[in-house]
Amino acid sequence: MEKKTAYCLLFLVLLVPYTALGAVLKRAPAKKEKRAVPLAVPLVYWGASVSPAVWNWLLVTFGAAAVAAAAVTVSDNDSHSCANNRGWCRSRCFSHEYIDSWHSDVCGSYDCCRPRY
């Protein structure tokens, strides 16, 4: 009989605080919704000149205020510097250059051409 009593007490100890806690949670006031934190423009685009396609993507993703604060400018075409001014966006690379596929996404329809060292 002592075993049943111990089990009953154990279940009472486990269940009673849960029901009391549930009653307290129901009476708690609802929390205010938090404002969405705006996303920051990635550092690779700060102060950069990007293609029109990348410019539109930045505007849609981060908003005009964030893009203006990051000093991102749009170029009239896809021919501009890439890879932190170590390469140039071109439709065809010269013979002394190679295509840097890692940084080509900022070039739009062109490839990021970097010199071979």
Swiss-Prot record:
Protein's organism: Branchiostoma belcheri (Amphioxus)
Main location: secreted
Keyword Disulfide bond: yes
A Gene Ontology cellular-component term: extracellular region
GO biological-process terms attached to the record: defense response to fungus; defense response to Gram-negative bacterium; defense response to Gram-positive bacterium; killing of cells of another organism
Pfam families found in the cross-reference section: Defensin_big
Annotated protein name in UniProt: Big defensin
Signal peptide: 1-23
Localisation: Secreted
Entry keywords, A to Z: Antibiotic, Antimicrobial, Cleavage on pair of basic residues, Defensin, Disulfide bond, Fungicide, Secreted, Signal
